Design a protein with these regions (language model features):
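Second-shell loop/turn segments in exported
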Residues: 1, 16-21, 29, 69, ...
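Peptidoglycan-targeting cell-wall enzymes and recognition modules
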Residues: 1-9, 30-126
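Surface-exposed patches in mature extracellular/periplasmic domains of secreted proteins
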Residues: 18-30, 43-46, 132-146, 187, ...
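Acidic helix/loop microenvironments that form the catalytic cleft of cell-wall polysaccharide enzymes
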Residues: 34-37, 136-155, 181-183, 194-203
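Secretory-pathway/luminal and periplasmic proteins that interact with or process carbohydrate-rich
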Residues: 36-46, 151-159, 186, 204-210
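Extracellular low-complexity, Gly/Ser/Thr-rich intrinsically disordered linkers
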Residues: 110-156
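Short acidic, glycine/serine/threonine-rich helix-capping segments at coil-helix boundaries
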Residues: 171-218
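Long, low-complexity, intrinsically disordered segments
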Residues: 227-258
Length: 258
C-alpha cells in the first residue's frame, strides 16, 4: 500500500467514522499529529528490536501486558500507534459499541495492521482515549494537542510544519505567502503564531470540504480469518442524533501534501 493509498484510506475512515474529526479546524490538527507520528504515513507498525524500552513492556500489569510475549504482540500499530494489551482491549470495546463490529483487536492484534482498518486506532485515540483532544483542536491549541498525543513536546517543530502543510492544502493554498496575502497579513513566508491563528480562523469559516484527490484503494484481505469478524466496520445504523453515530462528511483533499 503506497503513501497515496494510505492518504485516501485514512481520509475515507475519517469521513465515515470520524464524526467531529471532519470539522476542518479539527481535521488539520488531527492530520498534523498523524503525519508526524507516522513519518508522513511511512510507518504504521512499530519496528521491533527489541530495544531496551520495548523490553520494559514485559510483565507490565499496568499496561495490561501480563502474558509472555505481550510486549511484542501488542506493539504499536496504526498511524498513531496503539500499544499495550489494555489499549487493544479498549479499542475493541469502542469499535463494538460504536459501530457494531465483531472484530477483536485483543485476540487478533495484527488486524490493526490491515489496510481495511487504517486510521481507526488514531480515530479512537482522539474520540475516546483522549476526549479533550477535540476541544483543544477546536481552539487551535496545537501545543496542548501535542502534549496530549505525545505526553510532551517531542518533535514539536515538525508537528507545526505538518499543521501548516495540512491547513494550507485543506484551504486550497499552495504556499504560506499565498495565504498571508489573501488574509491581509504581512507577507514574509514565515508561519508564526499570527499566521497559524489566521489559518485556524479560515478553516473555521469553510462551509464545504474540498474533495479527495485520490481514489480509495482496494482493501487488503491479508488479515487472518476466524470466527470473529475481521472486516472493517459498516456505517453505524443508529440515528444521526445518536452520539454514538458519527456523522459522515464530504471527503477532504490533501493529496498534494508531501
Amino acid at each position: 500500500m503506497n503513501i497515496d493509498d494510505r492518504k485516501a484510506a485514512l481520509l475515507a475512515r475519517v469521513r465515515d467514522y470520524g464524526g467531529p474529526l471532519n470539522e476542518l479546524p479539527v481535521l488539520a490538527q488531527f492530520l498534523a499529529q498523524v503525519m508526524h507520528e507516522s513519518g508522513g504515513l511511512r510507518y504504521v507498525r512499530e519496528i521491533w528490536g527489541p530495544t531496551k524500552a520495548q523490553k520494559g513492556y514485559k510483565g507490565r500489569a499496568d499496561l495490561g501486558n501480563t502474558k509472555p510475549g505481550d510486549g511484542s504482540r501488542y506493539r504499536g500499530r496504526d498511524v498513531i500507534q496503539v500499544t499495550r494489551r489494555a489499549n487493544y482491549r479498549a479499542l475493541t470495546k469502542w469499535t463494538r459499541e460504536t459501530f457494531g463490529t465483531k472484530a477483536d483487536f485483543e485476540a487478533l492484534p495484527e488486524l490493526l495492521s490491515d489496510p481495511g482498518w487504517l486510521g481507526i486506532g488514531a480515530i479512537w485515540y482522539f474520540l475516546a482515549a483522549r476526549k479533550d483532544l477535540i476541544k483543544y483542536c477546536r481552539e487551535g491549541n496545537i501545543e496542548m494537542v501535542t502534549r496530549r498525543v505525545n505526553g510532551g513536546l517531542n518533535g514539536y517543530q515538525d508537528r507545526l510544519r505538518w499543521y501548516d502543510d495540512c491547513a494550507l492544502k485543506l484551504l486550497g493554498f499552495g504556499t504560506v505567502r499565498d495565504f498571508q496575502k489573501s488574509a491581509g497579513l504581512v507577507v514574509d513566508g514565515i508561519s508564526g503564531p499570527k499566521t497559524r491563528a489566521a489559518l485556524h480562523v479560515a478553516l473555521s469559516h469553510v462551509r464545504e470540504t474540498p474533495k479527495i484527490e485520490h481514489k480509495p484503494p482496494v482493501m487488503s484481505k491479508a488479515a487472518p480469518v476466524s470466527d470473529i469478524s475481521d472486516k472493517a466496520p459498516k456505517r453505524p445504523a443508529q440515528r444521526a442524533s445518536d452520539p454514538k453515530a458519527p456523522t459522515p462528511a464530504k471527503q477532504p483533499g490533501w493529496g498534494a501534501i508531501p
